Amino acid sequence: MFLAQEIIRKKRDGHTLSDEEIRFFINGIRDNTISEGQIAALAMTIFFHDMTMPERVSLTMAMRDSGTVLDWKNLNLNGPIVDKHSTGGVGDVTSLMLGPMVAACGGYVPMISGRGLGHTGGTLDKLEAIPGFDIFPDDNRFRDIIQDVGVAIIGQTNSLAPADKRFYATRDITATVDSIPLITGSILAKKLAEGLDALVMDVKVGSGAFMPTYELSEALAEAIVGVANGAGVRTTALLTDMNQVLASSAGNALEVREAVQFLTGEYRNPRLFDVTMALCIEMLISGQLAKDDAQARAKLQAVLDNGKAAEVFGRMVAAQKGPTDFVENYDKYLPAAMLSKAVYADTEGFVSAMDTRALGMAVVSMGGGRRQASDTIDYSVGFTDMVRLGDSVDGQRPLAVIHAKDEANWQEAAKAVKAAIILDDKAPASTPSIYRRITE
């Protein structure tokens, strides 16, 4: 039997906690026998004293085990259980293509996703732009969809990692969110509760990233890979660029539209293609569905070219109570904004920098995201035809097309877009879509 205050004291004094002590504390968070003050105190001691790798693994496993851990063995699936997690960005719609692409190649993707957070868009919010789409099927239905379709994208239920929910709520109001061991534990507790064989992390870098510097993004990626592998799940991470909007669009229905166009081949943004393909390749190799990069790429390109990936997406939408002909008739179903018109720069020049975070917040301000949990979302608003870094803009080439609910909404967004996009008289050096691959 342990005392919570003695565990806090031990960590406060810079000592290493045992697996048993960590499990006792996390179980107390779940059972409400540990107070909010005690959670806050331990979070602050971890913030200042960090955690060893064994402590990080113990924390993650204890939070994972605080609720249901999905077990797929009795389904006798003929492929690996794999998933991807992104730290979030603007125009980051990769999940909507990646899940169906990997499923079409023989993987099973039980993706448990989140809503928008701050300036970043949420996969669940995007999918809810599809009429009828059910993000909370019951457990049996979720398992049936995975078995039949190969991919389902759902929201987190109360049974998955419940200790994390309470721990995070306390961190959020005590300035202890940005601690790498605590971020790592929070992300992985939920992902590892999916019962995965393999995981790939997409850790963003740049002006629209969760972590403010390259070094911190790199440290987070290394921590997640180390802990997840320590927990027995094959995991790699990619550091990917978020110094510009990833897709050509930002906004819920607009990004769903671009995802369908990507899958059908109607339109594929080159940077979005690079990042999506690279993440899928990691999943196929880690899931032992391909022996190397070249084989994985060939398989993925084949399911795009033969329409199988688009078909899987359509089947997933139908299985989750969306329209059965969504892929064929997406424009019929997705909500459209009242006003769509281009915004132009006041001067000519090359796009040299972009405040991606500000562009994400502009979508939120238009009604495309939440400032508080009770807000309702306008799924139709946002941007399309976004410029890229290095593009030349003038009276012919707009910065973006703004989809707004009215003229005042459009004017406010236009001001934000102009302020967020920096022009220069010469083109900047090109930046990679992917900075680094981390395997250990």
From Swiss-Prot:
Task: Tell me which family the UniProt entry assigns to this protein.
Answer: Belongs to the thymidine/pyrimidine-nucleoside phosphorylase family.
Database matches in Gene3D superfamilies: Nucleoside phosphorylase/phosphoribosyltransferase catalytic domain, Pyrimidine nucleoside phosphorylase-like, C-terminal domain, Transferase, Pyrimidine Nucleoside Phosphorylase, Chain C
Indicate what this protein is called per its UniProt record. Thymidine phosphorylase
One of the GO biological process terms? thymidine metabolic process
HAMAP family found in the cross-reference section: Thymid_phosp
- Primary role: The enzymes which catalyze the reversible phosphorolysis of pyrimidine nucleosides are involved in the degradation of these compounds and in their utilization as carbon and energy sources, or in the rescue of pyrimidine bases for nucleotide synthesis.
Pathway annotation from the record? Pyrimidine metabolism; dTMP biosynthesis via salvage pathway; dTMP from thymine: step 1/2
Q: What is its EC number?
A: 2.4.2.4
**What organism is recorded for this protein?**
Salmonella arizonae (strain ATCC BAA-731 / CDC346-86 / RSK2980)
Q: Does the keyword Phosphoprotein apply?
A: no
Matching NCBIfam families, A to Z? PRK05820.1 (NF004490), T_phosphoryl (TIGR02643), Y_phosphoryl (TIGR02644)
Recorded hits in PANTHER family, A to Z, give: THYMIDINE PHOSPHORYLASE (PTHR10515:SF0)
- State any GO CC term: cytosol
Organism's domain of life?
Answer: Bacteria
- What reaction does this catalyse? thymidine + phosphate = 2-deoxy-alpha-D-ribose 1-phosphate + thymine
GO MF entries: 1,4-alpha-oligoglucan phosphorylase activity; thymidine phosphorylase activity
Arranged from A to Z, the UniProt key words for this protein are: Glycosyltransferase, Transferase
State the top-level EC class: transferase
Subunit structure comment from the entry: Homodimer.
- Keyword Nucleus listed? The answer is no
